[in-house]
From Swiss-Prot:
Family the UniProt entry places it in: Belongs to the KdsA family.
Entry protein name: 2-dehydro-3-deoxyphosphooctonate aldolase
Lineage, broadest ranks: Bacteria, Pseudomonadati, Pseudomonadota, Betaproteobacteria, Burkholderiales
Associated pathway: Carbohydrate biosynthesis; 3-deoxy-D-manno-octulosonate biosynthesis; 3-deoxy-D-manno-octulosonate from D-ribulose 5-phosphate: step 2/3; Bacterial outer membrane biogenesis; lipopolysaccharide biosynthesis
Catalytic activity: D-arabinose 5-phosphate + phosphoenolpyruvate + H2O = 3-deoxy-alpha-D-manno-2-octulosonate-8-phosphate + phosphate
């Protein structure tokens, strides 16, 4: 698959989707995107900047949602233009899709909406690559149906049908907790789409702080190393210069100062794993 000018797949180095969870200010977006561009360029990691103009599924109605579509897209467009990096953001309704698609390179669907057929079809017909997140409630094998909906919709419009990614972000494990079943990364390959591991939302504790979600960012390195060892096309990882002051998902964000060291580890593992064929491909009887 070709994504933002680079090739992605299990025979290529992993790519990174990263940035602050939500657009907080123009300066923060520029600073974080600039630093991530420096780090990934030095490590040879294809990079897509991510941030949300609106967090439509916050735990509480009083939580910060973002600057809104108009201002948020203006800031994301500036990052894209001034820093010359591709940009990804999420859409939350069919009405938003045509507008957002004009300002970013990649669209993303929220995990909660992966079963909404009309929404998935509308995103697929945007003409943009789409990172489709697996719902916390969904079996990994069921992502085949989600991806197929997207492909069918794209083909109906005469659009490429090989521009969709399947993203794992953890599975609900009782109340206020998620677990990552690493088998899901291999199972989701059966979609025929590149698989992305969301390392930061996978350590989220949904609603764990009453009016907001908690998180265990100390496990981001653990799970991201495991995912790279399984073999994935990409890694999604939110970051912030000061997670304690982040306006959304701070408890599971990677401190920006630690991104370089973590990515260095992941690059080392990725090179070892992808240097040889994956053994599981030969284990069928």
């Amino acid at each position: 698959m070709k994504l933002c000018g680079f090739d992605v797949g299990l025979d290529r180095p992993f790519f990174l989707i990263s940035g602050p969870c939500v657009v907080e200010s123009e300066q923060l977006q520029m600073d974080v995107a600039g630093r991530l561009k420096e780090i990934t360029a030095a490590l040879g990691i294809p990079f897509i900047f991510k941030s949300s103009y609106d967090k439509a599924n916050r735990s509480s109605g009083t939580s910060f949602r973002g600057p809104g579509m108009e201002k948020g897209l203006e800031i994301l467009a500036k990052v894209r233009r001034d820093l010359q990096v591709p940009v990804l953001t999420d859409v939350h309704s069919e009405a938003e899709i045509p507008v957002v698609a004009q300002h970013v390179d990649v669209l993303q669907t929220p995990a909660f909406l992966c079963r909404q057929t009309d929404f998935i079809r509308a995103v697929a017909q945007s003409g943009k690559p789409v990172n489709i997140k697996k719902g916390q409630f969904l079996a990994p094998g069921d992502m085949k149906n989600v991806i197929q909906k997207a492909r069918d919709a794209a083909r109906e419009k005469g659009l490429p049908d090989d521009v969709f990614m399947a993203c794992e972000r953890g599975a609900s494990f009782g109340y206020n907790n998620l677990v990552s079943d690493m088998r899901s990364l291999a199972i989701m390959r059966e979609t025929g789409s590149p698989v992305v591991f969301d390392a930061t939302h996978s350590v989220q504790l949904p609603g764990g702080q009453g009016t907001s979600s908690g998180g265990q960012r100390e496990f981001v390195p653990v799970l991201s190393r495991a995912a790279i060892a399984v073999g994935v096309a990409g890694v999604f990882m939110e970051t912030h210069p000061d997670p304690a002051k982040a306006l959304s998902d701070g408890p599971n964000a990677v401190p920006l100062k630690h991104m370089k060291a973590l990515l260095e580890q992941l690059v080392s593992i990725d090179r070892v794993i992808k240097a040889q064929p994956l053994l599981e491909n030969d284990f069928s009887c």
